């Protein structure tokens, strides 16, 4: 085996710093992956936000061999049906780069009818070795790395934990030096090669760069390519870096993974000898070429934007139509604040239709409380806030009393006994006799669960509280900030319900993805209960009154949990007993039950095999149900405006609705918060659905029916290999057609355009999302219609055109 070949050393020696800087840039070109316990939607194009769609298409074609738009026939069908008009095509055609766009509308139509070339990634050494040796080296590499990574990243699923001392690279070297699988497959001397490799991951990368003969220009593209071949394992390393940086630290896991992958490459090149050299020379030259969009990339970008303009026209028509909603005279009877999640739109519309005295509000589901929460009888701190932020307050469940401490101890003992029993069931020896010895005990449970007869209960832990207590000034500042951010500083009803949301499903590894994204992949009742307690505090209310926010003495704030799978709402009445509100609570319960029935009936029409609203509750308990709900499939728009602009209008559960009134936003601090937090979170959700639809092979989690949970952190298809990311195919497709229309999010904000522009100037990373059209930005006038807004253009490799204002219509 030739492990020290220099026949491919075609470049001058590169410095350590240059190589590692390229590795770090490549690490930031891939998105992070959150573990299953707290999975949240992530923008798969996070590393490409600084460039437009056509450039991202060119880059990801080289790195992953994928297309980032739908096939041409998808757009052709919409053009033929009239859904996309010539006007929709004309504007993006005019804005496209002149050197690459079709010369005319007829030429563009001709291009739509043509078949787009299949995207091809630049090959790795493993792929070249597969083609020359007829051995599936990419599959073997993925399988062996996945086998090790499942144990290394395990979060309690494995019975035997893998040692983690020294980091990922060091741990892998120990395993790899004893793994003979590569040598059996034909990679002679691999274990010895790994043993002789540098002990430090960065040094190993530098050494492999020399062995592979990489030029400086090829580094970024090649490193990016290798990290994409790792799938979710590389993204899990990126997640560790993300989490470390939130606290001002760093993490080398993703660099370690790159070093591991490069050792495979260098070993395969040395083993392949001269047979691989010509193909590898060609690949290096391709990696070194600057990334450049092609005319096909530009055509696809034009078609994608045309589809989005068509959707924006429809949305504008809905907003312009007369609203059937009626405004109650006098004090409203019930106010209910929901998360901005698109699933809340259906329930809010249903609830408001029952009585003109009902008013709903939309706000980010963590309710402005950036908390790390410890559940009852647990020491694990759950970050129940947007993943862009770090917790500022630690909370826990239950009072600090002797009886609570005794209950806590009892619950911990029970949990340990349950874990011990679970490990006994799976142990190497006892597992064989377990079924025969204890099977009859489980008959009733199996029947109950298998027939979906088991009852499900909403989370009902003891009321949460700050772990260390908060002084009055801190509590008052929090309450003031939150109420102003909600545009909710007056007109309080007797009963104000703060509804977090979650999803109660069974046998679903991605269950946390159905919870509240703003709560970090957890359900939102903890945040809602904390805020209700804060706003019921008499001292806080007195302080708020001194600041001009007067809450009537008869106003009761109460937390609730909206189950988005069944549209059942749980009221946490025991948190704040109030006999004087018994009638209000009874009426609210009736309204919520009626609204739930209306919402279920509307959602049942979209769900396969849900012929009646009663079927929905059954689906939530069905072990075999792969589509208990559609979650956020179909999300299309984000609207920040007073509720009166959208009340009574059927937005079909496709819009994030955030209450905002700029007239009460002195200095536009709330607007800045909306643009830099909820809008960004919504963009991550939208683009995850987009990526899982247009490129399911790379940005989707594959087929739910084949999923196996590995390490408690993610899923693989089948018995192992690459960790899958994104959404399962069943989350965007009903078996016959797509249920998610892949459109980039349209952001509509009722605010002065100048204020929006000033905020974006201060936040270049957010501005880049609009400049490069990962998001579309519009401003609404005082009647809730599109008025002068933004259509920004920024093409770094081409001449930069200034952004334009447009009036009264969706225009360029």
Swiss-Prot record:
PANTHER family: INORGANIC CARBON TRANSPORTER SUBUNIT DABA-RELATED, UPF0753 PROTEIN AQ_863. The keyword Membrane applies. Belongs to the inorganic carbon transporter (TC 9.A.2) DabA family. It comes from the Bacteria. Pfam families: DabA. Forms a complex with DabB. One of its GO terms (cellular component) is plasma membrane. GO terms for molecular function: zinc ion binding. Zn(2+) binds at residues 339, 341, 501, 516. Keywords: Cell inner membrane, Cell membrane, Membrane, Metal-binding, Transport, Zinc. Coiled coil: none annotated. It is a peripheral membrane protein. Its cofactor is Zn(2+). This is Probable inorganic carbon transporter subunit DabA. The lineage of its organism: Bacteria, Pseudomonadati, Pseudomonadota, Gammaproteobacteria, Lysobacterales. It is found in: Cell inner membrane. Part of an energy-coupled inorganic carbon pump. It comes from Xanthomonas axonopodis pv. citri (strain 306).
